[in-house]
């Protein structure tokens, strides 16, 4: 899925369908209903909305009783909305924004970079950057790694819970701005069940994809059951790698990508399995081990060159609209598994829960990095520094070969008092350790031996390092019913974070005297590197809190007020001249409501909030393309979130979610720290920075809008069901809108990239279900909108930004799915 400027293209027959006609088609089932077996009888007008049970506060509760801005997509809604991956449900959750990132150096599918409530500073950094500010969980297990979260295949899923706002009291460090929880269906000893689904789809001007998935639930006896889930899918491509050439100014060398030309080259193949066992030891104790594993092989770039068709950039004017001109292989081989164990039981009247999880992920990736060499040669003549053993200038293009290994282990032990008591508590201990083994080799074919990284042929830059992050915490919340309808809750989390980074990064000593081998202080060949020039660590101790007052006006209406804090751990910078960056904190002031109306036919929930983000972390590419992380300054996010569900008639149900955000800096960002370590905020034109440079003003002024998040995001879904030939048929239309966004915090970089334009995506579907089987036809992105999701360049924006890449929403896709349950 991708985004960029709409470019004129040939009119296609389907695009001639007017919006009014499409809407009329989606909401006018009379032609089918006239032949239905029976019309809705009068007693069918009493349909109400289903009660939704959640575990957001680590205990089972009615959604309407939980004093959190919480949006839930249940199993039925996930199936009805054809949700198969993160991008599908992200557009249905207004508080959720995201970036795109593949595994390793790959720019295709893989990791999920999620943000909530506008808490995003934007960055062009790579590895060794800040941890995510929002967390993702699979059941009880965190699946957010240092680089991002796993993109879970959404099949046999019970629900998705999106908790907006700081959740750091009951959840881990990455829950600074919110938490997304994916809850799977559990083994059921009460009976056998199974099902499968077969899906085929065609992307307009793209390839053909398919999905095969199934599950089986097998009782072993009255106290135990096994549930197995499997999937295999092919995501079709729709971006072409087209023919082109490139000439380097310094050497005059011209390269050609004829051997890499391929249509629809950004495809992916995925296979996965999930298995879980439930064993009821007795009436009070249950053990549930789970294993989920997936392998994905992806190719090509999801980014599209907006200059396609422009002859000044070497393109044929008749080139395909969604295309790039890349010269080197781009792929990712991504394998991961996570094992977990959940033990639930009772100690007296108290509920005791222990959760263990262990995740391992390995990614082999390769990426085109030719833009780096071309633009540095064009702007600064850097091509003169790349030669062979004969002293002749060579093609300075680079490509990257990388291996990334991720490990994460966590333990949580918590105890909860009975829910029906006037005084209630939840308390626990949490420990986790995660590591990222990074090996990235930047290659230039034919490079002279005396300027390559020592011992690594054709390698201009090598990164071989290991990052470790450890978190320990003790947490708890106490709730007291002041009256039958007024409850006061307070919570605290005390934590310690440790971060370390060891290894090698940089050039060979024949190429640079300031970065790489020349800076080594140990001859240890760490992970195959020639030596060690980095071995640093840091740690922090602190605490955060939460206070909530909830008033249950009556059984159907509740209001609450919350003060809460969230944090994100700090860490170290690879560049030795930079100090560690510290944890950043988010303080939330929130007023919310949960209400049901018209005999539970209408649910209207919402929250109004202000969040202060202090000393937030900002990652960017500095000198030599090296990631630097600074505590920038402060920002404020004001927002309003609304959630609506309406059973309008027995046949028609409407759901919607909307969010408005005003996220901006509250002080100048100058780009350096004061002697006391705090961010400098006063830097008018003419100020001399610590490096002796005269600046023209702040990099981002007070009042600058925070990037990534739109000022408005919303979605609306309408589903009409009716009897048809002994079964139930439906028509459905979904509309998701997102406003424009900036791409970078800094003014100069933001100006280079420009804004990501606002867009509206429309999905249509229809289907029929009878007994245990169903058939669905769907049309995603029905009007083939070029929704702009993200924009990036291969190197720093001020160098390579003239050749940026835009990630678009997947073009119009027609699909057919057959499902059967037993």
Language-model-detected regions and their locations in the chain:
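C-terminal beta-signal and adjacent terminal beta-strands/loops
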Residues: 2-4, 725, 736-748, 767-822
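N-terminal Sec signal peptide and the immediately downstream disordered periplasmic leader
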Residues: 1-93, 217, 283, 287, ...
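Transmembrane beta-barrel wall of Gram-negative outer-membrane proteins
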Residues: 204-301, 405-411, 415-432, 466-479, ...
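Solvent-exposed loop segments that connect transmembrane elements
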Residues: 238-264, 299-327, 368-401, 441-464, ...
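N-terminal periplasmic accessory domains that precede
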Residues: 86, 112-115, 162, 175-198, ...
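Membrane-embedded beta-barrel scaffold of Gram-negative outer-membrane proteins
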Residues: 213, 340-370, 552-568, 582-647, ...
């Amino acid at each position: 899925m991708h985004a960029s400027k709409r470019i004129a293209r040939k009119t296609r027959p389907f695009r001639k369908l007017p919006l009014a006609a499409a809407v009329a088609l989606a909401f006018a089932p009379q032609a089918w209903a006239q032949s239905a077996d029976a019309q809705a009888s009068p007693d069918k007008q009493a349909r109400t909305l289903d009660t939704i049970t959640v575990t957001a506060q680590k205990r089972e509760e009615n959604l309407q009783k939980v004093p959190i801005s919480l949006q839930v997509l249940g199993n039925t809604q996930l199936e009805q909305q054809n949700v198969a991956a993160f991008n599908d449900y992200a557009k249905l959750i207004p508080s959720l924004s995201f970036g795109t990132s593949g595994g390793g150096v790959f720019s295709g599918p893989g990791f999920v970079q999620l943000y909530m409530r506008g808490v995003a500073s934007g960055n062009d950094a790579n590895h060794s950057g800040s941890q995510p500010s929002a967390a993702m969980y699979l059941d009880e297990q965190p699946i957010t790694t240092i680089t991002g979260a796993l993109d879970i295949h959404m099949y046999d899923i019970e629900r998705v819970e999106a908790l907006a706002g700081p959740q750091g009291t009951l959840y881990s460090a990455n829950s600074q701005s919110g938490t997304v929880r994916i809850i799977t269906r559990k083994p059921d000893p009460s009976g056998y069940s199974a099902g499968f689904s077969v899906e085929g789809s065609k992307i307009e001007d793209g390839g053909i994809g398919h999905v095969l998935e199934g599950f089986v639930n097998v009782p072993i006896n009255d106290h135990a059951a096994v549930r197995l889930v499997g999937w295999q899918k092919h995501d079709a491509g729709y971006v072409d790698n087209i023919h082109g050439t490139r000439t380097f100014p310094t050497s005059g060398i011209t390269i050609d990508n004829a051997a890499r030309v391929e249509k629809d080259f950004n495809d992916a193949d995925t296979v996965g399995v999930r298995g879980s066992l439930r064993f009821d030891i007795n009436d009070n104790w249950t053990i549930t081990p789970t294993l989920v594993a997936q392998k994905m092989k992806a190719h090509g770039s999801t980014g599209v060159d907006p200059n396609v068709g422009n002859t000044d950039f070497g393109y044929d004017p008749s080139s395909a609209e969604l295309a790039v001109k890349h010269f080197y292989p781009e792929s990712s081989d991504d394998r991961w598994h996570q094992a977990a164990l959940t033990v639930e039981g009772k100690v007296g009247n108290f509920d005791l829960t222990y959760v263990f999880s262990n995740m391992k992920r390995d990614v082999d990736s390769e990426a085109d990095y030719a833009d780096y060499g071309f633009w540095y040669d064009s702007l600064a003549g850097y091509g003169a520094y790349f030669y062979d053993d004969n002293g002749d200038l060579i093609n300075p293009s680079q490509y990257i070969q990388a291996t990334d290994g991720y490990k994460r282990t966590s333990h949580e032990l918590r105890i909860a008092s009975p829910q029906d008591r006037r005084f209630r508590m939840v308390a626990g201990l949490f420990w986790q350790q995660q590591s990222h083994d990074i090996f990235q080799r930047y290659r230039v074919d034919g490079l002279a031996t005396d300027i390559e990284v020592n011992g690594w042929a054709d390698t201009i830059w090598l990164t071989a390092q290991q990052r470790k992050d450890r978190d320990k915490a003790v947490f708890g919340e106490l709730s007291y019913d002041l009256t039958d309808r007024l409850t006061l809750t307070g919570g605290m989390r005390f934590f310690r974070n440790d971060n370390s980074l060891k290894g090698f990064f940089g050039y060979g000593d024949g190429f640079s005297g300031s970065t790489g081998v020349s800076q080594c202080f140990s001859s240890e060949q760490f992970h195959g590197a020639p030596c060690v020039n980095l071995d640093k660590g840091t740690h922090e101790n602190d605490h955060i809190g939460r206070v909530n007052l909830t008033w249950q006006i009556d059984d159907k209406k509740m209001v609450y007020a919350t003060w809460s804090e969230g944090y994100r751990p700090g860490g170290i910078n690879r560049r030795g001249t930079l100090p560690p960056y510290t944890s950043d904190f988010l303080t939330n002031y929130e007023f919310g409501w949960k209400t049901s109306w018209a005999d539970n036919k209408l649910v209207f929930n919402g929250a109004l909030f202000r969040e202060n983000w202090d000393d937030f972390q900002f990652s960017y590419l500095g000198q030599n393309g090296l990631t630097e992380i600074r505590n920038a300054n402060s920002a404020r996010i004001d927002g309003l979130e609304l959630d609506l569900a309406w059973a309008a008639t027995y046949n028609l149900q409407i759901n919607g979610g909307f969010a408005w955000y005003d996220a901006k800096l509250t002080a100048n960002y100058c780009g350096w720290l004061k002697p006391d370590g705090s961010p400098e905020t006063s830097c008018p034109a003419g100020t001399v920075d610590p490096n002796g440079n005269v600046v023209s003003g702040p990099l981002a002024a007070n009042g600058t809008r925070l990037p990534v998040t739109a000022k408005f995001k919303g979605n609306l879904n309408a589903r009409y069901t009716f009897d048809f030939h002994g079964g139930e048929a439906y028509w459905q239309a979904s509309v998701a809108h997102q406003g424009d966004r900036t791409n970078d915090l800094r003014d100069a970089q933001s100006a280079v990239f420009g804004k990501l334009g606002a867009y509206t995506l429309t999905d249509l579907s229809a289907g029929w279900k009878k007994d245990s089987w169903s058939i669905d036809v769907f049309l995603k992105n029905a009007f083939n909108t070029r929704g702009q999701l993200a924009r990036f360049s291969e190197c720093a924006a001020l160098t390579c930004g003239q050749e940026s890449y835009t990630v678009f929403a997947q073009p119009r896709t027609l699909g057919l799915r057959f499902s059967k349950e037993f």
